[in-house]
Amino acid sequence: MPELSRLVAAPSVVNIGHGTLNTLSDILADPALCPGSRIVVIAGKNSSQEVTAQLRELVPDATWVTAENGTEEAAQILATELRTTGFDLVIGVGGGRILDIAKFVAAANQWPSIAIATNLAHDGLASPVSILDAQTGRTSVGVTPPVAVIVDLDLLKSTPPAMLSAGIGDILSNISAIA
């Protein structure tokens, strides 16, 4: 028997590369990852037209919601509103704030989620934590990590240089933290 044991929740699928957004169809076809066809996409108001156009082709029947406010209260309201409709899966598309909202909404409703990153300046793509703004500052909320993470390098070409540099810094800090 091990002296120390730890179970770490992690995504089942992590697709990073050129054109990986197209792997979404395969992920959605897997009933172990996507238990149904009722999908809600949570995106930011500044989401790239290119990304949203591609996603609308890949999930034409999805319901789209724009998340404008990264507060815990707004995320709770959104989770409650979406619960009344009932979905099988949440797809978050955007940067850190949007992906944290999507993870929170999914966890609050016990739905799986998929994270589609549109920038790298976020060190919590696959983490079991959502960081949301609260009245007293930022709060960390435990959530279920996404079942899949997609980072399509073709979508990152238009990332502003400052965000790209911040993302590289996040990656390096995570590597050193693990080591």
Annotate each PLM feature.
Residues 47, 69-70, 97, 120, ...:
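Glycine-/small-residue-rich active-site loops that bind phosphorylated ligands and cofactors
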Residues 82-120:
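A short, small-residue-rich loop immediately preceding and capping a beta-strand
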Residues 17, 25, 94-96, 167-169:
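Glycine-centered flexibility sites
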Residues 12, 108-179:
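A glycine/threonine-rich phosphate-anchoring loop and its flanking beta-alpha core
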Residues 1-89:
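ATP/NTP phosphate-donor binding region
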Residues 24, 48-51, 97-103, 122-125:
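Short glycine/serine/threonine-rich phosphate/pyrophosphate-binding segments
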